[in-house]
Amino acid sequence: MTDVTVKSLAAEIQTPVDRLVQQFADAGIKKSDVDSVTQQEKEILLAHLNREHGSVPNKLTLQRKTRSTLNIPSTGGKSKSVQIEVRKKRTYVNTPEAEQAKAEEQAQREAEATAQKIAEEKAKREAEEQAKREAAEKAKRQAAEKEKVTNQQTDEKTKPAQTDKARREAEAAELKRSVEEETRRKVEEDAKRVAEEARKMAAENEGKWPEPVAEQTESADYHVTTSQHARAAEDENDAKVEGDRRSRTRGGKATKQKKGNKLSESKADREEARAVGRKGKRKPSTLQQSFNKPVVAVNRDVVIGETVTVAELANKMAVKGSQVIKAMMKLGAMATINQVIDQETAQLVAEEIGHKVILRRENELEEALMSDRDIGVEAAAEHRAPVVTIMGHVDHGKTSLLDYIRSTKVASGEAGGITQHIGAYHVETENGMITFLDTPGHAAFTSMRARGAQATDIVVLVVAADDGVMPQTIEAIQHAKAANVPVVVAVNKIDKPEADPDRVKTELSQYGIQPEEWGGESQFINVSAKAGIGIDELLNAILLQAEVLELKAVRTGMANGVVIESFLDKGRGPVATVLVQQGTLNKGDIVLCGFEYGRVRAMRDELGRDITSAGPSIPVEILGLSSVPAAGDEVTVVRDEKKAREVALYRQGKFREVKLARQQKSKLENMFANMTEGEVSELNIVIKSDVQGSCEAICDSLEKLSTDEVKVRIVGSGVGGITETDATLAAASGAIILGFNVRADASARRVVETEGLDLRYYSVIYSLIDEVKQAMSGMLAPEYKQQIIGLAEVRDVFKSPKFGAIAGCMVTEGVIKRNNPIRVLRDNVVIYEGELESLRRFKDDVSEVRNGMECGIGVKNYNDVRTGDVIEVFEIIEIKRTIA
């Protein structure tokens, strides 16, 4: 323990420093106010003070309750029964005299008990000896009687013998009497000796017993008694008081009590006083509270989680919320009392106020759950099949290539011939098994391609020999490099006449993909998905690359993997396509998957067959999750379903808190930008898709379409069919409903018809994005353009009583039309802009005058037309704007 100074010790025990120094001096320790005090010196001082002032005597507090019924006569003549409860409290103190008397009494009782026990043992032994002597005497008497009967015949002869017998009997009686007296004397001596030893023990214990001092309290009512007689007398006194009270009540002399003005007197005290009929003065009570304001600031240990509201932080520090907000304003942060702040901000605020911060890790339960897993550490890692992701630009033949390898017709089943989902398949070849992931090539599926690159071992980059490197090809290269995955290039459509593989190599080399023949690390294989050219070479190249990577995994133990895709099936519930990466996934396992959890109720392979287990690099569909997980979430098998549920709920709450904190922060930072939001048009959309990945891709693509004038707002999105809830949401928010590979049920269609909603179905993402663009274009404010349609040169000016100044003009360009807006130019400078009011040719009103003809032009509300001016006639054209 750290030593403290005399001054700090005096402040701690709230005593003057001079008095504490004097007490140390009395205890034989010389100290000044700046000297340090050790723990041993504290104990010496405490022992000295105990000797001087003594210790608090031991005390015992007893509480008693008595209940009775009091009949009070009322004005109506009927008596009123009142329940009376009297509570009494007695405190008994163990004083030195009581302790001494108790010790002597105890010693005396022990001595008496010991003496009684010894006496009983002596008496028992004496009784046994007496019984033996009586038996011997009885035998002697019987022998004597027998001898007497025998010698009766010779009475005369035996007279001297009888005299001897009487003498012997007298001697035996005298001996018996002397033995009894000796025994009684010994018992009395033993009892005296035991009593003397008991008194000596009591005297020794009296010296060893601690000497208590009476407690120095003025208000305590201590009854120093422990005997049964004292308690009996007290009970008699209570009964007497109660009897007097009853007699006074029956006599109708209930005493009025004075109303006290003590705020501290309770209703129970008043009832007790009324019951016992007290007339005397009540015990005065103080009206001040016992709380003393802390003199020194209290420094607390504040435990802060990853996120906390301002109100919770103030509660932890025992201060008002306004004080926390004030401290945050000093640090340059604005917040409300219900706002969620992050851990770093809360730490700065708590330290600013002066408290010690303890940062808490809130994912302890998750760490404990993950540590309690059988991951098969003792088992040896075995070779596993490579996971190959096929990437490339749209329509470059990725699915067709995989289709030829699998010998199925997957490409024909895709809407529009393009892949909308990540397809996961494993293929058995002659040289081993390969797992393929087919990713979409459309720009909208960027996140799906990135997800495929994270879960893969090898990327097969498909490039069309006749098309070359395209934008999605470059994006696929970036994903592969970010994931640090080797790339095998498949130059497809090599059978076309316009194929140019060398151009593909040259273009890819600009992005860091160098072929092996040029000294690089990437294998280039020329293939044709239609003709089947180079397929075996491609598979061998993949297996060769996998052999170089030495891919291994533990097959035993609890499995973990990644969600490739997920969707909601109407009959089966949430379905997730999972790629197992470690261990073995069995039917019935408890899995934790992102925000969701559940037990694997069924497992199916890519062909729809039910299976019971799946090892590393095997893609499977699992059923039994609580909801549809997000694609890309990690799947982990755990032991306890209850803990898995707690972790999933914690993750959901954590995600919500972080999202809310991020929204609050962005609101404050973008305050000025949000002031102009009222001028922006919004297109509200509700999106429902068949799988999670497509839903994400569509939402990202539509949000990227937002401009400064039209903003796309995704009101709702989800997986599964369009329900009545979706239709109601769209009706409330004025949104259009877009279904991607899903349909609306009967109740939803009924709401759509009733509310007149716009419901559209799509199976190709191109069409969906194009139509949303058209809808956004219709919401744009129109753009107007001025187009000059004719020029007329003023040759002469003459007056008209009806129109004023009339300009005689020659049309030099275009056509002059009546009632069109015009400009008057003088020296190529616009001096007036107005409207053409009158157009005549040979005194006839005409609607238009063409190039090379003369006409008279009257300008509305303008008479300052001069010779040499140019009249420019134009029209305003509305240009329809579109979203780029």
Curated annotation (Swiss-Prot):
Keyword Oxidoreductase applies: no
Region (G2): 417-421
Region of interest (Disordered), ranges: 93-288
Compositionally skewed regions (Basic and acidic residues) per UniProt: 99-209, 231-246, 262-275
Domain tr-type G as annotated: residue spans: 383-552
Coarse class of the protein's main subcellular location: cytoplasm
Keyword terms, alphabetized: Cytoplasm, GTP-binding, Initiation factor, Nucleotide-binding, Protein biosynthesis
Taxonomic superkingdom: Bacteria
GO CC aspect terms: cytosol
Residues the record lists as binding GTP: 392-399, 438-442, 492-495
Functional note: One of the essential components for the initiation of protein synthesis. Protects formylmethionyl-tRNA from spontaneous hydrolysis and promotes its binding to the 30S ribosomal subunits. Also involved in the hydrolysis of GTP during the formation of the 70S ribosomal complex.
NCBIfam families linked: IF-2 (TIGR00487), small_GTP (TIGR00231)
Name of protein: Translation initiation factor IF-2
Species whose genome carries this gene: Yersinia pestis bv. Antiqua (strain Angola)
Gene: infB
